[in-house]
Each structure stands twice: as C-alpha cells, then as structure tokens.
Amino acid sequence: MSNTQSFFSQPLAERDALVRGALSKELERQQSQVELIASENIVSRAVLEAQGSVLTNKYAEGYPGKRYYGGCKFADEVESLAIERVKQLFNAGFANVQPHSGAQANGSVMLALTKPGDTVLGMSLDAGGHLTHGAKPALSGKWFNAVQYGVNRESMLIDYDQVEALAKEHKPSLIIAGFSAYPRQLDFARFRAIADSVGAKLMVDMAHIAGVIAAGRHSNPVDYAHVVTSTTHKTLRGPRGGFVLTNHEEIAKKINSAVFPGLQGGPLMHVIAAKAVAFGEAMTSDFRTYIDNVLANAKALGEVLKEGGVDLVTGGTDNHLLLVDLRPKGLKGTQVEQALERAGITCNKNGIPFDTEKPTITSGIRLGAPAATTRGFGVAEFREIGRLILEVFEALRANPEGDAVTEQRVRQQIFALCDRFPIY
C-alpha cells in the first residue's frame, strides 16, 4: 500500500494508538458513569457522524452566497439548513450559526452593540451568572464597566428591584439576562421593561435552557430581547458551539460583521453540519418528550435530596439543574465532587450565592438531568441516583477523606444501572 493510500485508509488505532487509547478510555468512562454535569449531554450518532465528516476539510470564510473561497456550494447548503432550522425552532427572523462557542456568541454581541468602556449589567458569577457576563477575569469584565446584579439573600431568586435600581443608576448600554447556575425561570418581560426604561439593549443568554425553550416549556426570549445567544450543546443536545438570534435586521447585520470578520475567521463547517442535525432533531415530538423527561427527572432528584436533609438553592428547580447547598451537611464542593466521581457519578463543584468558600473549594455542587435522561433514565432511576448520592454524603460526613467501601458499593450499583441503559 502506498503512503497516499494508507493516508486515506489507515484507521486511527493504527496511525495513533495513544490518541485512540485515550478516546477508548473516555468512551468507557461515559458508558459506565452517570453524567450529572448540567452543561453536558450526549449527542446522537448522527450528530457525531456529521461532525466527523469531510466538511472538516473545507474553508468557507464569509456567509452562504458570499464566500471568500471557491468550492463552497455544499458548505452553503449545510449552513443554510442550520440557519433556517434554528430560525424556525425559535421563531426568529435572523440567525448566525458560526460562533465557535457560547463565549464567542456573547463576545460578538458586545462587539456589535457596545464599545470598550461602556457599562454592561449582568448577573454576578457568585449569584449564578456566567464568566462572559462581566466577571472580572473575563474580557467582558476587563473591557467594559461591568456592573453585577445578584439574588435576594432570603429567597435566592433574582432581585429584579436591584436590577432596576442598578440600571437606573449606571445607565448600561447592554443588560444581560442568563445564567450558568440558576434553577428558576427568568422573567424576560421584566428584563425588557428595565432595559427600555434606561435605553439599554437586552441580550438573553439562553445557553442552559435553549432545549427547554425549543420544546416550548419556557417562554421564548426572542419575543422580548433585542438579541439572544446560546450554545448548541447542553439541553439542546447538539455539538459544542454557539449561535445568535434576533428579530431586528440592523442588529443582525452588526452581528454578522462582529462574528466575521470581527471575532472569527473561517467557520467550523463540520460543526455547523452537526448543528444542523441537532436543530432538526430538536424540532421533533421526541425531543419535546425528552425535555419533559429532563424536567421531571430534575424535580425527582431534587425531591429525594431534600427528603435526605439536603438544602437546594431556591428550594427546587424549574429547569434541568439543581444547585445543592452542602453547608447543612458540613461538606465542601471539591470534597463531594471527588467522592462522587470515585463512586461513578460526575458533577461539578459550584459556588452558591453568598458563598464564603474559595471558588476552588465552594459550598455547593451543581447537578443536571440532561445527559442521564438522554440515555433513557426516568424518574425511578433518578430517585435511585439521589439515594446513592445521599449514601456518599453520609459516608463523607463520617469520614471526610472518603469511604472507599461505600464508594465502591455505590460504584457497582451505578455500573449496573448504566449497563441497563447503554450508549454507542
């Protein structure tokens, strides 16, 4: 076999055994562990196939019909499919599907609608917001006068009166509604009224709840915001990437220029193909049933944890995630994250509102239902997972360094559970 022939035919296992080995171990991890990280999901075989397609080879700077490279006929076809599907999915007039991530989508809005030094009002990272909403370490916190709103100390719900007061005091150019760790619905109408009262643009970052919105189970922010951003993974169950929506033609033109050439060069056409597939999947009745199951499973998990004496921030959830306050159990986020992983359950440590622990330690964990629901888990399985989590909690209280016997017993039960619901 010639070198050229082998280049196109030699499988990964032969060409690079080290990478193949790591991928095989990662597949085994995903198959045998329960994934409760709220921002993660499991994509379909079709999405994987599209992302691993020959579009990996294609440069396509520009937009459909207006490329800076030749040979883009089929790239145009794929991107146009993605655009039309996401517009239909969220009833939006305009869409840009090229952002490589949610952070890039948010950055493109800031580039399009603000200038360095402007005031931006977003949710504090400490209260459940996202880095890109004005956190000090992020570009949005360095290039802008970032003012942050939070939650009520008693209810742990967004303090809309505070949002309004801060908006009137600081006169932001942009108000951001969205979160990375907030378990309740957002009042988009209230946010828009506040934005209008000070002449600000409203951006909704729906990354975490895009799938819930697509299924019609939460209100659609496109009806309220000047511009909406999102990731394509999480509850939308697509590849890792981003997109931007708006109903305003002038804003759409600015967004397109901000994405390319403002922030990015060539789009990742293989990822856009996978986005198109995921958008198509999200338009089905099966997807709506899936989201209903996600919401039911998250509630069931929360109920079991509360029955076991665990505090939930806001007392429960309206969406796919739970924010668990570990302080009543005398535990730390890092400690619990590590113990649960040893027991076959992956989650992430997470700060809670008014947390006094360092971000590397935290007083909480974040749990989510999307990935385990994708593999077929229902309410019964999530209640079982909740009971197993409580076992690990109690073992940690008795032995803060970890209880190997309990963790191994739980891991065996988790493995048996996963074996009943195989993936790939």
Swiss-Prot record:
Protein residues bound to (6S)-5,6,7,8-tetrahydrofolate: L125, G129, H130, L131, E250
Secreted is among the record's keywords: no
CDD domains hit by this protein: SHMT
GO cellular component terms, semicolon-separated: cytosol
GO BP annotations listed: glycine biosynthetic process from serine; tetrahydrofolate interconversion
Assembly and interaction partners: Homodimer.
Name assigned to this protein: Serine hydroxymethyltransferase 2
Species name: Cupriavidus pinatubonensis (strain JMP 134 / LMG 1197) (Cupriavidus necator (strain JMP 134))
Chain's gene name: glyA2
